[in-house]
Amino acid sequence: MRLLLFSGVFLAFVAPTVQQCVDSDGACSSWVASDRGACQRKEYIKKNCRKSCGNCPIYEAKFDTRRLNPQLQPIRQLVGRWKGEHTGKVTFPTIPTFKYSEEVEISIPDGANIRSLNYTAAAWSSDKEDLHRESGYITIKPNTREVILTTVMSNGFITVEEGPMFGNNIKFILKDIGRISFVRDEHLHNLVREWTLDQGYLRARLSIQTLSHRMQEHTSILYTKTSV
């Protein structure tokens, strides 16, 4: 059996506010106009004169939750770019245990009426070898707390996963799976993907069951949010 390596992702659904870039001291504009270098030399000005110093973060439109379709508001905390650098672990009876890194991007599509989030994930080994990629969509079943994830994977699998949202957590359970005819991985019988958001960190765990092995943890990883 070769590496399946599906991304895992449990979360807190607290509505965030988009941070405004402003000066907290009314004298900032005068200070900076008379001495531009003060933005680098003086800690007080650097901290309290962000607008005048031009130290405002750049918000990418695809991560700006003010653009989010109302139906998707309960999962707004998923939106962003998440990276786990050497924080992933792969285990399964048929392969050696090893560490990996992964970047997940969950973004808002351009169309205002599109009721799903774009999802991509890319994993690589400690020596930068490409291990696994997948892409798909995340949405919510109308008038429920059921979250749906669809994926197309670089190893030839296609999945439909659904699960309830409880507080900080989503637990996706495999509902349907497709595979190309010549894929050599062992037949996947079941899959459970768990995502948890904990104070700005995204913890992920994926458990799988094959025809010859019971349900057990296959991958786990801790992501840090890298987008603004």
Which role does the model predict for each range below?
Residues 37-41, 74, 130:
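Short amphipathic alpha-helical molecular recognition features
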Residues 77, 140-142, 165, 197, ...:
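Generic beta-strand structural signal
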Residues 2-6, 54-116, 122, 127, ...:
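Amphipathic/hydrophobic helical signal segments and adjacent flexible N-terminal regions
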Residues 92-183:
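Central antiparallel beta-sheet cores of small beta-barrel/beta-sandwich binding domains
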Residues 2, 8, 12-62:
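Compact disulfide-stabilized, cysteine-rich extracellular microdomains and processed peptide cores
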Residues 182-228:
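Mixed-charge, glycine-accented linear interaction segment located at domain edges/termini
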